[in-house]
From Swiss-Prot:
The lineage of its organism: Bacteria, Bacillati, Bacillota, Bacilli, Bacillales. This is Translation initiation factor IF-2. It is found in: Cytoplasm. One of the essential components for the initiation of protein synthesis. Protects formylmethionyl-tRNA from spontaneous hydrolysis and promotes its binding to the 30S ribosomal subunits. Also involved in the hydrolysis of GTP during the formation of the 70S ribosomal complex. The keyword GTP-binding applies. Residues 264-267 are annotated as: G3. InterPro entries: EF-G-like_DII, IF2_II, IF2_N, P-loop_NTPase, Small_GTP-bd, T_Tr_GTP-bd_dom, TF_IF2_bacterial-like, TIF_IF2. Gene3D superfamilies: 1.10.10.2480, P-loop containing nucleotide triphosphate hydrolases, Translation factors, Translation initiation factor IF- 2, domain 3.
Length: 707
């Protein structure tokens, strides 16, 4: 028996591929998708399930064939007896008998040939499945009817179509409904899209509780690394230059039998770089605020990042053991950003602690466990391993290495894996304690080697049973990423805003405002919120006082937003990042101009900006006055070139005396399009004849600024 794919088997029996896959799983057969080939023994087992009467039918057919043969033998015996009894009859009668016998045989033969035609008439199925773009011929075949019948139906509906015409979903539904057939559209699975392997954990009945993934964020020197150091009882801060976290790591601790995974991130990478690539890894955010310092600019940024990612926040009020500590002031300041303490009737958990002495750490861990229990975080360790890259590097001795966070399933040494646009086989696996491990379950951070290249932080990974499949998918994703890099970024800007609105791609215009003083920022934000254009809502996602920095650009890129600077400039890092990520930055000094520009962009009326570009200069050596023409300037091009369509200005003793357009440009008696440096020419200027010797004619053109 030849091999057959799952969907082909399902199609032959008018079944759903899902039903066949479910039955295979009951048979303990590992199934990746509907394209998997079936073994002969698997087909036999499926036949027993889906063709319960197949063996009985065969026996009935055999019995019918035997009866037919017996009937034919009896007829032959009777014919022989009759022939023996009538042997003495004349030849004419014999001849007639033969003709009659032949006629009977011919009739029998005709009936035998026509019988299969009656059997070939198939009944229309009650339900069919179809793929997008199905043709008339393919639909007719699935419905067991003639293609001409569908063509007639379409003609009556006012649709001219032939047998090879593709049909849209609505037309297929109309035809099927007319024949009383239920239809279902087959979903074509793109195996190169790793997102399809990230199942919704809540829908999995076999999912079990998993550890929470926690990110610690806050302002510089408020004690983020010291807090994490105190939690896991190690000394990272002492070995780091300037006390600043210099790498991304992930660490797992155990508290009262419950595991918690912490991401140690520089700045807000967990919420920006990863979220910009579509990854969501964090379950809970710990916002560290120093009790003696209060809310600072990076604290506000951290709040905005966490809210944008829709992640619950636990506020850790650090340094409460200092004499100048004022926890109540911190609570008061955070209420301005929507974080209301539980003691004041809000829903935000505040935990006072000292990262240095360790006071309050147990309370914080208890709150983390409590919040994670409320969230009901679950995963299925029996599934294929999927997750996200936390960090990656090229190690001199080990080659490409990647720190991964397993989000679902179990990752094992030897698994074939696709990580972002890279692929390979897990050669070795090390946990956060530096020990080699053979497997890692959900919410477990590990570092792996064995991939062919260095992936990016935030890339997703998926394991496969077949290394060839992993290689094929990895190579295809790599080629696709190269093509995408060559294409223009689709980040929103005021220039393409109206186009995206028309295509239905834009629902919210995310704006980040940076200004010189708080009053200006608040006034600008209030004015922008009043803009009312059908189709798009203005959404202020972050406001702050100070220069535009790299963090603002990263947030704008992650949120597909634009940055407005009011009386402030971007620093060098922000400029470079904005150019790399194609983030639109607008700098203004007048509030009215900001509102007018954004409103015009939303209405599709944003005028292009132009700048003047000087293309050449010519010195007037001699003048000629001609009736009906005016003054002709005999010139020598001293710099660049003079073109016929250029704008010109006449400069006399360093002062511009006239600005207008060229009328004619000639060399000898011929009209020319341009005259280059070092050549002489004749020039006349529209509506200006007061040209004098030694005047300088400067040519320029207006060039549109690329935004």
């Amino acid at each position: 028996m030849s091999k057959q794919r799952i969907y082909e088997y399902a199609k032959d029996l008018n079944l759903k591929s899902k039903d066949v896959i479910d039955e295979l799983k009951k048979m303990n057969v590992e199934v990746s998708n509907h394209m998997q080939a079936l073994e002969p023994n698997e087909i036999k087992e499926l036949d027993k399930k889906f063709k319960p009467g197949s063996s009985k039918d065969k026996q009935d057919n055999k019995a019918a064939q035997n009866n037919h043969k017996k009937h034919q033998n009896n007829n032959k015996d009777k014919n022989n007896n009759n022939n023996g009894g009538n042997a003495k009859k004349n030849n004419k009668k014999n001849h007639n008998n033969k003709n009659q016998k032949n006629n009977k045989n011919n009739k029998n033969n005709k009936n035998q040939k026509q019988a299969p035609k009656q059997e070939a008439v198939k009944e229309m199925p009650e339900k069919i499945t179809y793929t997008e773009g199905i043709t008339v011929g393919e639909l007719a075949e699935k419905m067991n009817i003639e293609s001409s019948n569908i063509v007639k139906k379409l003609f009556l509906l006012g649709i001219m179509a032939n047998i090879n015409q593709s049909l849209d979903d609505e037309t297929v539904e109309l035809i099927a409904d007319d024949y009383g057939i239920e239809i279902e559209k087959e979903v074509v699975i793109d195996e190169e899209d790793l997102d399809i392997y990230f199942d919704d954990e809540e829908e999995d009945p076999d999912a079990i509780e998993r550890p929470a993934v926690v990110t610690i964020m806050g302002h510089v020197d408020h004690g983020k690394t010291t807090l994490l150091d105190s939690i896991r009882n190690t000394h990272v801060t002492e070995g780091e230059a300037g006390g600043i976290t210099q790498h991304i790591g992930a660490y797992q601790i155990e508290n009262d039998g419950k595991k918690i995974t912490f991401l140690d991130t520089p700045g807000h990478a967990a919420f920006t770089t990863m979220r910009a690539r579509g990854a969501q890894v964090t379950d809970i955010t710990i916002l560290v605020v120093a009790a003696d310092d209060g809310v600072m600019p990076q604290t506000i940024e951290a709040i905005n990042h966490a809210k944008e990612a829709d992640v619950p926040i636990i506020v850790a009020v650090n340094k409460v053991d200092k004499p100048t500590a004022n926890p109540d002031r911190v609570m008061q300041e955070l209420t301005e950003y929507g974080l209301f303490p539980e003691d004041w009737g809000g829903d935000t958990i505040f935990v006072p602690l000292s990262a240095l002495s360790g006071d309050g750490i147990d309370d914080l861990l208890e709150m983390i466990v409590l919040v994670s229990e409320v969230q009901e975080l679950k995963a299925n360790p029996e599934k294929r391993a999927v997750g996200t890259v936390i960090e990656a590097e090229l190690d001199k001795s080990r080659g490409p290495a990647a720190s991964l966070l397993v989000q679902n399933g179990t990752l094992n040494v030897g698994d074939a894996i696709v990580v972002g646009n890279t692929y390979g086989r897990v050669r070795a696996m090390v946990n956060d304690a530096g020990k080699r491990v053979k497997s890692a379950g959900p919410s477990t951070p590990v570092e792996i080697t064995g991939i062919n290249d260095v992936p990016q932080a935030g890339d997703r990974f998926v394991t496969f049973s077949d290394e060839k499949q992993a290689r094929r998918i990895g190579e295809a994703r790599h080629e696709e990423s190269i093509i995408q890099q060559r294409q223009e970024s689709k980040n929103v800007s005021l220039d393409n805003l109206f186009e995206q609105m028309k295509q239905g791609e834009m629902k919210d215009l995310n704006i980040i405002i940076k200004g010189d003083v708080q009053g200006s920022v608040e006034a600008l934000a209030a004015s922008l919120m009043k803009i009312d254009v059908e189709g798009v809502n203005v959404r202020i996602i972050h406001t702050a006082v100070g220069a535009i920095n790299e963090s603002d650009v990263t947030l704008a890129n992650a949120s597909n937003g634009i940055i407005i600077g009011f009386n402030v400039r971007p620093d060098s890092g922000a400029k470079r990042a904005a150019e790399q990520e194609n983030v639109d930055m607008r700098l203004h000094r007048v509030i009215y101009n900001v509102i007018e520009e954004i409103e015009a962009a939303m209405k599709g009326m944003l005028d292009p900006e132009y700048e003047e570009k000087v293309i050449g200069q010519a010195e007037v050596r001699q003048t000629f006055k001609v009736s009906k023409v005016g003054t002709i300037a005999g010139c020598y091009v001293t710099d660049g070139k003079i073109t016929r369509n250029a704008g010109v200005r006449v400069i006399r003793d360093g002062i511009v005396v006239f600005e207008g357009q060229l009328d004619t440009l000639k060399r000898f008696k011929d009209d020319v399009k341009e005259v280059a440096q070092g050549y002489e020419c004749g020039i006349t200027i529209e509506k200006f004849n007061d040209i004098k010797v030694d005047d300088i004619i400067e040519a320029y053109e207006m060039v549109e600024i690329q935004r």
